[in-house]
Amino acid sequence: MKRFKKILLIIMVIGFLFAGFQITLRFLAEQRNKMVEIVADYKDFSDIALQLNIPEKEMANKLIGSGVTSIAISEERLLDMKDEGKLLLYSGVDLNYLNVHFNNEYSSLATSAKSYLDNNLIPYSNVTLVLGNNEDTYNFLINSFKTRFRGITIDFKEGNNFCILINRSMDKVKNVGLGLTDEDFEEATKLGFNNIIPRVENHEGITPEEVDSLYSQVKKYKVRTIIFAGVTVFGQDYQDEKEEILKFIGEKFSQTDAEIITAIIEKPAETDLETIQRGIKSLSKYSNYVNTKVYSADLAQLQKLTYEGLVEQWGRAISQRNVRILYVRPLAKAEKTVSENFENTLKAIKEIKNRIKYMGMELGNAKGLGSVKQNRYFQLIMGFGIISSGFFLLLIVFEEDKLKKFLKAIYILYGIILLGLMFVYLILPVYNLFGDLANKLLALIATISFASIGGVWLIEYSERCRELKDKSNIKEGILLLIVSVLVAGIGGVFVGAILSDSKYILKLDTFRGVKISFLLPLLIWGFAYVIKIGLFKDSNNKPLPLLEQCKKLFETQVTVKYVAIAGVFLVALAIIVMRSGNTMVSSASSFELTFRNLLEKYLVARPRTKELIAFPILLLIPCLAKFKSREWSFIAMGAGMIGIENVINSFCHIRMPVFVTTLSTIFSLIFAIIIGSICVVIVDKIKEKF
């Protein structure tokens, strides 16, 4: 059995070396992606300029001076064009009052439209009329309506005057995106920003010719990034089951040396991005992940947040969620004037600009992440290492004499699992079908096995410390803490490596096993404690058999004190589990948020709260282990397990950069050594007195 254990260790080491190489590739890809772009919404700030009665150019200069690098422009809409004086917009029912609404240069066209509706028995209430006298506007609308309102429009012309009937009610057409005009780009160019970002909207029946036209237009104005507007990406069509248009767009926009980056909207952790913009996963895959993530505070946040709070939101998005485009809209607090909200928005932009530089990043045009290459043969070797860790855990939990009769079955099971992995990873059609599932299962096994190995180490080292009465509690505590974190870190590297595909980094796919990986290692640790130390012992001070211990436990009379302690423990555990993973249910308290914000302001990577609490407790274990009663060391180990699990949990947040995850744990260790050492001195003093 010792030989088998050595073989498992060797395979784990080899797997870890390959995992280290893979996670290094991911780290290098993330390090190349250090350009942050600050984008202002043109319409929002144009409205602010109008309310403050200042020229748009002056508004633009203020934004650029604060740190804004780019301006986002939205597609034309009938309602906006009406407000800008480019056209007139009427509901069909207005034709009932010709003399009131059309007693002008358009009266003849309106009469023709009315006759057409009457002759074709079309109800006025189902119709919208668009009128104007500009040839460029007419040509733009006709070309746009051919695709947006295919087959439901008819137009009338007299000289430059035109009337276009749309066989849809006003509510259904007034806010439909109609595309971008050259005039929109030229006006934005004059404002002096480095980059123009069009907000492109989807519509049914997009053709390759339309894609080519859009690509030519954005290239003409040196556009580098597109952010999709609406609930579907440009090209998403339910009737296009083979996704031919999405594939065409993805390949077109990701051409080498001529790529247009498509931005992915960043939303809360529990939100599936496909529900925000349908088609984004497929388009990202077809564009070889030449994508970046964009974050914008929503209206509810803008109405609530102070400028400091907005900066914290932006900073967290950049450092912890790999966001590289900040989409800026003005603060909108009701108790502030428009001018005050605008000035506070400028303050927030200046503050985040400074923080971006403090993080070691640069302001400029965002770059696409690109494809982080994964080699399935490397994944196979990592898989061997992860499976070996599970069997290694089995061998260190149970005593050798208890496993002897099962050794043959263990060897056979181990071989079957390795053969199964080879079948999945070596046969390409099988890998294409089940590779993702296999990677997620292996990641789940790694989170459970390495956290549990760390838990078993706590038990064994704690027992060893009981016999070392004269040794330094601080040195022993630091050793225990570092080894525990290293074991967990190895598991984290396996997880971060096997899930280092671009789709996980961009959060187009998610690892959902974090809550299970929090609970199971705790149960395994408790099980190992009962087997190795025992809640009940025989006359030789050896742990009773498991079933006998369970029987005695159920027969034990329990006081209210222990019920209360158990209740507190279960509530705390429930909160921790709900707040773990990629689908957080329970939020942090206002005090914790304030503390987090303070740490994030001065540290590039904030130590995670659970680690800040659990790591110092881990350092206390050797000191507490020397108490006659094992109760305190047992409680400390249980609390310390949360910290060990949290190290691996941090790597499960794949969208968080590897550098930030690692640095966060290092900061937690530094704080823990300082705080924990002080606590050890205090506990030692208390022991001397009592």
Name what the model sees in each region.
Residues 2-18, 22, 384-690:
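Alpha-helical transmembrane segments of integral membrane proteins
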Residues 15-35:
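Membrane-interface motif at the C-terminal end of an N-terminal transmembrane signal
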Residues 29-376:
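Soluble extramembrane regions of membrane proteins in the secretory/endomembrane system
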Residues 328, 341-384, 391-426:
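Large, well-folded core regions of big proteins
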